[in-house]
Curated annotation (Swiss-Prot):
Protein name listed in UniProt: Bifunctional protein FolD
Biological function: Catalyzes the oxidation of 5,10-methylenetetrahydrofolate to 5,10-methenyltetrahydrofolate and then the hydrolysis of 5,10-methenyltetrahydrofolate to 10-formyltetrahydrofolate.
Binding annotation for NADP(+): G154, R155, S156, T181, I222
Its EC number(s): 1.5.1.5, 3.5.4.9
Assembly behavior: Homodimer.
UniProt keyword Cell membrane present: no
Amino acid sequence: MIIDVKPLYEDIKVNLLKRIEKLKRTPKLVAVTFKPDPSTVSYLKSQEKAAKRFGLDYEIFEGNSPKGVLKILAELSRDNNVNGIFVTHPLSQVNEMEIFENLVPSKDIEGRHPYNLGMLAYGEEFFAPCTAEAVVRIMENEIGIPGKNVVIVGRSNTVGKPLAIMLLRRDRSATVTVCHTKTRNLSSITKGADVVVAAAGRPGLITVDMVEKDSIIIDVGINVTDEGIIGDVSKDVANFAKVTPVPGGVGKITTILLMEHLVKSAEKMNF
């Protein structure tokens, strides 16, 4: 069975439009990149389309050198007309910590800044990483979280690690196991889970023999192949369990949450 995230998307959309109407000025999101590959360019175009759909301002800045990128970030961080900054990653030839040194946490609407991740650990975050938050929203909408046995396959700083922290919060109280591609006997761990989150970046990693019948499988993977974009979950798993689609699942919710974070930043800046 395919999990339809459209009702959740529409709920977020309705609430977001109401918040935008209350603003006195139009929020602005700026994407910063350096030597983007075709897939990055394609993603930025879809991001721009999403921003325009909500009547939000959007601009792309492309640095001409690694130092140029850092200079752009520092300038945008000081610009009171900019509410959110999105940095494409990985950013070729640019050290990630140098990026964060030049990016003010209050405009890091992706929630990737060490300050924001640290606040997340204390349950005091202003921004959570968008993809991790998208997974939580889908889980809350589909199954409810307290007491659930959740296995996360993936340990990235943007999904696996922050998602584990978010699910362990007292108001969610999931039992969380974090695995990765080096985990031995992975199927013996995923088999007993109520929810499996596939976020390892490996096409078809999760197969039908690895999951419980009617369990929830959230596919975070985005893998570009000759067949198109596919996730980390084999297609036949949907005949046995409930699976989010790729594309049109987690990514759809992630994008609208990025816009929600932008509006949240604008509200804080009294726009």
